[in-house]
């Protein structure tokens, strides 16, 4: 495949259901992703074993937004892992000193607001990546999983979509069969 892993980390409830993840899956890439958009359909098609799920569900996010209960600073305070990542944004680890302010802005936004709940999903995202990495190292099993992915994802093919649109939406028949 063109890629072995497809990372689809949109916040649940915020993805407009793009097709990039389908293209990766059609080519055998296994998905590390949230329960959002087309990821849901892909996971149903390929099976739980071929999908590395992580993150909050749409209902949880909506509830936390509605009652203003998400406090990103509390997530930061509870996790040494997240502290290390966040504190690296506040250093010059990623850029020259004159650009540190750009990363500081990201740091402050994530700790004060984090509308998309990045910090809430971050530790689970890391765990999902580690599971995928572990599985990837078993090359024979990974190859089998990639083949299963291709075999199970056919309903997302453009041929099937065009035939279904022709029949159900455009109400036209093929010129020749």
Locate the predicted segments by residue.
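Catalytic binding pocket for nucleotide-activated donors in carbohydrate/polymer assembly enzymes
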Residues: 1-146, 150-155, 160, 164-177
